[in-house]
């Protein structure tokens, strides 16, 4: 399989993919190189798009959505790993193929994934009136999760120290851009398009309620037993052990789970173990400024 063809792109464990800008948003250079193709992607009316800022519960939501589509059939979800079941539109790793090619080869109905900010979403999704599910996570936990992810994922820039990364994240100089702009852009779009806007913290606190919401949005009718089954199979502890969902099939040269596992904590409030008092004050001040123009609010702890 393509997974094992590493010869055209060799990692020695130190090399990382380079990055560049697309319309002011930092992206891996390979993504920048095919930007026109991504922008011109042709969606189909029955496509379901899952959109998130990186590390906001993407994989979790993908599993839930697929189980809803398949009416709780767990075996169907074990047919292939996450990155093969859900084409990641703007992603390309020379040895693993590209999300675009995957999407084009996939029969309908497709469940697709993107981390693009709303203003960079290929227009065809809106023209075809596709259903889009957006998940937002509080920025403190999101930052911590993204930091650990960049440590283990060679397809993204080296995050440096936690202190350095804290500044990088606040400045929005990470791949897919500023968290603040991302969540606000999708929030502003949600009432004009078929967008279901969910929160990671709600999914944690009351998973059944949120699964029910997704089921209604996808227009499926599932009984209580199936909903409970979906909640069970998409709980953090079960998913962490699921080799088809925990990204353990990606070669270690790209994702090194010994540095930090892909499924690390899946918790709300883990940021308290990372933020110093000074960082927290600085973050809150910055947050207040950047979020002054929106009614969007987040839960930072339970």
From Swiss-Prot:
GO terms for biological process: 3'-phosphoadenosine 5'-phosphosulfate metabolic process; flavonoid metabolic process. GO terms for molecular function: aryl sulfotransferase activity; sulfotransferase activity. Keywords: Cytoplasm, Transferase. The keyword Cytoplasm applies. It catalyses: a phenol + 3'-phosphoadenylyl sulfate = an aryl sulfate + adenosine 3',5'-bisphosphate + H(+); 17beta-estradiol + 3'-phosphoadenylyl sulfate = 17beta-estradiol 3-sulfate + adenosine 3',5'-bisphosphate + H(+); bisphenol A + 3'-phosphoadenylyl sulfate = bisphenyl A sulfate + adenosine 3',5'-bisphosphate + H(+). GO terms for cellular component: cytosol. Substrate binds at residues 113-115. SUPFAM superfamilies: P-loop containing nucleoside triphosphate hydrolases (SSF52540). It comes from the Eukaryota. Belongs to the sulfotransferase 1 family. Sulfotransferase that utilizes 3'-phospho-5'-adenylyl sulfate (PAPS) as sulfonate donor to catalyze the sulfate conjugation of phenolic compounds and estrogen (E2). Can also sulfonate estrogenic compounds, however, the dietary flavonoids (phytoestrogen) and environmental estrogens, like bisphenol A are better substrates than 17beta-estradiol (E2). This is Sulfotransferase 1C4. It comes from Macaca fascicularis.
């Amino acid at each position: 399989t393509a997974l094992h063809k590493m010869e055209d792109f060799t990692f020695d464990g130190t090399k990382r993919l380079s990055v560049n800008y697309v319309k002011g948003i930092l992206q891996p250079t390979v993504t920048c190189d095919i930007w026109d193709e991504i922008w011109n992607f042709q969606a189909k009316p029955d496509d379901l798009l899952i959109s998130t800022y990186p590390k906001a519960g993407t994989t979790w939501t993908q599993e839930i959505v697929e189980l809803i589509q398949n009416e709780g059939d767990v075996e169907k979800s074990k047919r292939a790993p996450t990155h093969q079941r859900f084409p990641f539109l703007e992603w390309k790793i020379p040895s693993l193929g590209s999300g675009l090619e995957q999407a084009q080869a996939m029969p309908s109905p497709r469940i697709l994934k993107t981390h693009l900010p709303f203003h960079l979403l290929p227009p065809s999704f809106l023209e075809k009136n596709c259903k889009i599910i957006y998940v937002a996570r509080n920025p403190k936990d999101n930052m911590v999760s993204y930091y650990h992810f960049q440590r283990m994922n060679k397809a993204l820039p080296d995050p440096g120290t936690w202190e350095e990364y804290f500044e990088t994240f606040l400045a929005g100089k990470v791949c897919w851009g500023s968290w603040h702009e991302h969540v606000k852009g999708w929030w502003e779009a949600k009432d004009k398009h078929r967008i279901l806007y969910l929160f990671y913290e709600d999914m944690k606190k009351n998973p059944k309620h949120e699964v029910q919401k997704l089921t209604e949005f996808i227009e499926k009718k599932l009984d209580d037993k199936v909903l409970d089954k979906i909640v069970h199979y998409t709980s953090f502890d079960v998913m962490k052990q699921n080799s088809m969902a925990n990204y353990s099939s990606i070669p270690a040269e790209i994702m090194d789970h010994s540095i930090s596992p892909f499924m690390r904590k899946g918790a709300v409030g883990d940021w308290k173990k990372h933020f110093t008092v000074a960082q927290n004050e600085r973050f809150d001040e910055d947050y207040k400024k950047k979020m002054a123009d929106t009614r969007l609010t987040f839960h930072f702890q339970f």
